[in-house]
């Protein structure tokens, strides 16, 4: 009853208030009465509706701004980044100069690999200057190469070259002398236009020519571009034809041909050494002592470097400068070259340059040091191996160079870098690196401990010239994997140090029937991990060194036995044990 009474009382109160509001004069304009009437009739409140509309407009505006930002970001990624990347050079990766055209000279070939021509022509008397001045413009003295912080390949300014358009005095003198541009100059990379005219100039001594003379010289350049393919040279194109009416003018640049009947057959091929200036005693800068190239294969370009021996610290300093005219190993017409350096006969210690993408004329400018006593330097040889980097298969060997007489070469003037032909080598055994680990077996506990110590000289699997290696050890029995253990990942290194123990439980009665497969794997954030190399130890391992290590472990229980093992390619090892079926493809990939 109390509930009904209260409800009835509330209804009566509402009716009373409604009557009072109805009798009040100007009740429609009274805020309280209007609010009360709206509540009685169920109408929404005005301020609440305004707040809802304002909140909705704010949400819509915010969503529009977010969508606009997302659309701008997607447009930038899809349009601006590819357009910007198209501006890169097809050879050296640098920006393509828009002002290069058919009428430019060698100055247009910035980083294009044609500076071996300018360096060779700079030492000829027709160009009015000694040879070493031309080389000094390209390579600074060796003292500057050994400044603090220079190790590791600091960048040097790009070399400049002879540009006929930039020297109207010499161009006018060439036109007056009747010198014609060589239409069959050696192939130059197409960064600035491979068909630029190369003029052989007499000694300059005239005044400034007029603008008309400058225009005449630039019009002599060929109007067509030549593809970057070797084309035969004839004896006529190797020399320039001066005006026969002038007897006092010196003859054209004499470029000597290779001697001997066999070398005479190579006249129709490009020979970069013909354009190198002559050194002391008439010896060309590309030849001389210590030019013992590896093998007698066909030349695969040229490599430039500088040597110096530090007597105080017994250090042989080697600076890799650049390479020219490398062969194309990829389907896109380029290569991804890098250089490995050994000081023979020791092949365990090696250095490697960075990988240069999509170029046939890489500029390295990287310095390395070998510790070698002066008494041993005469018996040591410097070995350069030029490789083409391949992300998904074995790296291709482009060629190699072997140098002896290192002390004599190190005493060459520092401002004159050495040039050598890169000779095509035979199939070189894949150098995947070495792994150092120890084995220890506890018979009473039935525990086999594999301590991964370190690895050295691993194969570079990333474009940075490094790898992200980790070690995976698998316990194998009758060709089946029973257990596996892994080490941690070491980032950006080819010589990782682990010092990590991997423990396996092996019963004493089973130790004669099991073995280990140890693989060094390169970790990839995107895609599958790649095996760098493997080594296998056990009583029936195919490698004799693996069998010896296992037998020594069993002969010395409770003592760690440490050995170095050479890594081999996984596909070359068909089975872990002789006569076993081997690991399945799925197990190997895990």
UniProtKB/Swiss-Prot annotation:
What is an example of a Pfam family matching this protein?
C2
Q: Provide the GO MF annotations for this entry.
A: calcium ion sensor activity; calcium-dependent phospholipid binding; metal ion binding; SNARE binding
Which CDD domains is this protein grouped with?
A: C2A_Synaptotagmin-1-5-6-9-10 (cd08385), C2B_Synaptotagmin-3-5-6-9-10 (cd08403)
Chain intervals for the UniProt region annotation (Disordered): 143-220, 234-260, 273-295
Please state where this protein is localized.
Answer: Cell membrane; Cytoplasmic vesicle, Secretory vesicle membrane
Write out the biased-composition intervals (Low complexity): 185-203
Summed up, the tissue specificity of this protein is: Expressed in melanocytes.
Q: Where is the composition biased (Polar residues)?
A: 234-243
Q: What does this protein do?
A: Ca(2+) sensor involved in Ca(2+)-dependent exocytosis of secretory vesicles through Ca(2+) and phospholipid binding to the C2 domain. Ca(2+) induces binding of the C2-domains to phospholipid membranes and to assembled SNARE-complexes; both actions contribute to triggering exocytosis. Plays a role in dendrite formation by melanocytes.
Its domain description in UniProt is:
The cysteine motif mediates homo- or heterodimer formation via formation of disulfide bonds. The first C2 domain mediates Ca(2+)-dependent phospholipid binding.
Summarize the subunit comment: Homodimer; disulfide-linked via the cysteine motif. Can also form heterodimers with SYT6, SYT9 and SYT10.
Q: Which named protein is this?
A: Synaptotagmin-3
Taxon lineage: Eukaryota, Metazoa, Chordata, Craniata, Vertebrata
Record gene name:
SYT3
